[in-house]
UniProtKB/Swiss-Prot annotation:
Its cofactor is Mg(2+). Pathway: Pyrimidine metabolism; UMP biosynthesis via de novo pathway; UMP from orotate: step 1/2. Belongs to the purine/pyrimidine phosphoribosyltransferase family. PyrE subfamily. It is an enzyme of class 2 (transferase). GO terms for molecular function: magnesium ion binding; orotate phosphoribosyltransferase activity. Orotate binds at F34, F35, T128, R156. The gene is pyrE. The keyword Zinc does not apply. This is Orotate phosphoribosyltransferase. GO terms for biological process: 'de novo' pyrimidine nucleobase biosynthetic process; 'de novo' UMP biosynthetic process; pyrimidine ribonucleoside biosynthetic process.
Amino acid sequence: MSHYRQRFLQLALDSNALCFGEFTLKSGRISPYFFNAGHFNSGAKTAALAQCYADAIDAANMNFDLVFGPAYKGIPLATALACEYAQRERDLLLTFNRKEVKNHGEGGTLIGAPLNGRKILIIDDVITAGTAIREVLRIIRNAGGTPTGVAVALNRQEIASETNRQSSVQALMAETGIPVVAIATLNDLLAFVEENASLAKFYEPLLAYKTHYGTEAPD
């Protein structure tokens, strides 16, 4: 497993962003783990997370000159990532959107650098159904930008349903042709748990969940 994946999963565990047990998801599935990026709730945690994002993005050779953070969780993630790249002597443009249209002041729904003519990397925590990302793609294209990739923290690698064996990430990539990179995946989480003696009791439930709901092909 790549070092940044290991760092991310340990950071998520230490921050309680990654928890093990029994969790009912929005889909109704009972998951043996739960990921909540809202628990990266300090400057140090967010900075460490941004380092993991940047390492994953660089490993994937993503081509972009602007980072876009969808409201709301994507906003601090994109901001922290832009700051991390500044530390790496790469000054990227930054934009995010608001969910409510502002009719006074600067107005509109976009805040930050203009998107027109830019190659844009979208930053978010996870992709669930992909609906929010598709809306962001529409916003970017309408503003004259070109979406060139999506980066998320965790790819759950789950099928959409028993009749649709694609994951939301696979469906999004097939539909749009836009690459999606994740810091870590369910496969990485399995390896992480297997290698960590204190987490050994969670390995079999995770494996059973992956066997039932995991995608047949890697994302």
